[in-house]
A protein has these predicted regions:
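Metal-dependent polysaccharide deacetylase catalytic core of the NodB/CE4 family, i.e.
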Residues: 31-129, 140, 147-161, 166, ...
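Active-site metal-binding loops of divalent metal-dependent hydrolases
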Residues: 16-19, 82, 199, 230
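Boundary/entry segment of secreted carbohydrate-active catalytic domains
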Residues: 1-22
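C-terminal domain-boundary segment and adjacent tail
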Residues: 1-6, 32-34, 43, 108-109, ...
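Distinct, well-ordered alpha-helical segments
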Residues: 26, 129-134
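Non-membrane alpha-helical structural segments and their capping/turn regions in soluble enzymes
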Residues: 93-98, 172-176, 206-209, 213
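Hydrophobic "anchor" residues on beta-strands that sit immediately upstream
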Residues: 13-14, 77, 225
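A Trp-anchored, charged/polar loop motif used as the substrate-binding/catalytic surface
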Residues: 20, 169-185
Length: 235
């Protein structure tokens, strides 16, 4: 954990999924406030167009192009989200390994460094002990994030089913309350505040981007907090 090397006991990290073009705007905001994020990509879906329908709104869900991955995510971390975004709990061992390890290898080639992180794809029950053990024992992945939020900032022992804290602006009240609590927290042991989401969700409501920036302004540039990618914070 890099923040321990800097004699800091608190760390904040972000994780955003799917590799959509809204990530570009998100990264501009992250950089403005000195924040770091891990972006979880599906290598076989890169470059593909897409539209989501949300409350009669058409929301862009265009994936970034493979050739742009390296420079778009420069300064942050790229991680595995599987080749094609299946629910891994429904697959056999061979297909789980293929979905994870081939995505990891393709992304590593795109970014020019070894990809070691992951976030489980699909909503609902998208991971279990069987899947986690297969990934741990058969791939180069060293940690993987779930979508099960926890109230605790304590460091977790199981990095292959690592639980985040809050689903960004879609849980705005919780996001701000946890942010304020983390800033004021005094601790002698490592504490991690982990936020996750999808950047295309910022387009669901006209004020979501401004709400996210307000949160960034609240938590950013604190001397006693380490801001790092998932790998920098967890490994």
């Amino acid at each position: 954990m890099k923040f321990k090397e800097q004699n800091k006991r608190k760390a904040i990290t972000f994780s955003y999924d799917d590799g959509v073009t809204q990530d570009i705007r998100l990264i501009e905001l992250l950089n403005k406030y000195g924040l770091k994020c891990t972006f979880n990509l599906n290598s076989e879906l890169l470059g593909k167009p897409g539209i989501l329908i949300r409350e009669n709104q058409r929301i862009s869900h265009y994936k970034v192009h493979p050739k742009d991955v390296k420079y778009i995510y420069d300064g942050h971390e790229v991680a595995v989200h599987t080749l094609t975004h299946p629910n891994l709990t429904t697959l056999d061992e061979t297909e789980i390994i293929r979905q994870v390890e081939q995505d990891r290898m393709k992304l590593s080639e795109l970014v020019g460094y070894e990809v070691v992180g992951m976030a489980y794809p699909c909503g609902g029950i998208n991971n279990d002990d069987r899947v986690a053990e297969i990934i741990k024992n058969n791939t180069g992945v060293r940690y993987s994030r779930t979508i099960t939020n926890t109230d605790s900032f304590e460091m977790q022992k199981n990095l292959y089913r690592f639980n985040p804290n809050v689903y960004h602006v879609l849980e705005y009240d919780r996001l701000m309350k946890m942010g304020e609590a983390f800033i004021s927290l005094e601790t002698e042991t490592p504490q991690i505040f982990y936020i996750w989401g999808h950047s295309y969700e910022m387009d669901f409501q006209p004020d979501y981007w401004s709400k996210l920036e307000a949160f960034f302004a609240l938590i950013g540039n604190k001397d006693d907090i380490f801001y790092g990618t998932n790998a920098e914070v967890l490994l």
